[in-house]
């Protein structure tokens, strides 16, 4: 039986992510995580690597951000044996919610979480597909903390390391972990 190292898994994941030039606008090099989802070996490796990192760390909930964070957060939550909580755009969750607005490059956006999804004392791991500037994750962390949860860690498939997201979250006391790093464009 062949043993695959974490470095080999990370290389498999990185190689499965397609780079699309000039999408969604000229000058942007888009990192397409959906190509990773099309490769069952790479997708499974990403879930395994995240679950192995956070197994036995006291995580009580996994929060995933809309929408690709759901694709990685829910399977990791199952692997850890804990609940999964979605953070969504306004009007998408049926029970009472709390919301947090955040600034984008051109405008603002809002995220919501069910008001009863996180309990005081929950140790929450936040998972998303990609970390760029960190605005979405900052709003997500604020929502969780408003509900009494603790967020010490956030995990990503991709970190666009030169766009400042990791520094932004570090300043909030959140340790970032990513499977692969790419420059942002």
Curated annotation (Swiss-Prot):
| Bilayer-crossing regions | none
Which GO molecular function annotations are given, in alphabetical order?
adenine binding; adenine phosphoribosyltransferase activity; AMP binding
Q: In which pathway does it act?
A: Purine metabolism; AMP biosynthesis via salvage pathway; AMP from adenine: step 1/1
Q: Which Gene3D superfamilies match?
A: 3.40.50.2020
Cellular compartment(s): Cytoplasm
Ordered alphabetically, the record's keywords are: Cytoplasm, Glycosyltransferase, Purine salvage, Transferase
The role this protein plays is:
Catalyzes a salvage reaction resulting in the formation of AMP, that is energically less costly than de novo synthesis.
Q: Which HAMAP family match?
A: Aden_phosphoribosyltr (MF_00004)
Its quaternary organisation is: Homodimer.
UniProt record similarity statement:
Belongs to the purine/pyrimidine phosphoribosyltransferase family.
Q: What is this protein called?
A: Adenine phosphoribosyltransferase
């Amino acid at each position: 039986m062949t043993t695959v190292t974490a470095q080999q898994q990370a290389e498999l994941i990185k190689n499965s992510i397609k780079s699309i030039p000039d999408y969604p606008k000229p000058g942007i090099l888009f990192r397409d995580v959906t190509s990773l989802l099309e490769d069952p070996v790479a997708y499974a490796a990403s879930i395994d690597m995240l679950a192995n990192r956070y197994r036995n760390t006291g995580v009580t909930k996994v929060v995933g951000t809309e929408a690709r964070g759901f694709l990685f957060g829910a399977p990791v939550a199952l692997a850890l044996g804990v609940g999964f909580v979605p953070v969504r755009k306004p009007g998408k969750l049926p029970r009472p919610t709390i919301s947090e607005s955040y600034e984008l490059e051109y405008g603002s956006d809002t995220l919501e979480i069910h008001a009863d999804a996180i309990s005081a004392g929950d140790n929450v791991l936040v998972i998303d597909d990609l970390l760029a500037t960190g605005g979405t994750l900052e709003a997500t962390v604020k929502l969780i903390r408003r509900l009494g949860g603790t967020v010490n860690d956030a995990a990503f498939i991709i970190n666009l390391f030169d766009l400042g997201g990791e520094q932004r979250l570090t300043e909030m006391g959140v340790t970032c972990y990513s499977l692969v790093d790419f420059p942002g464009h």
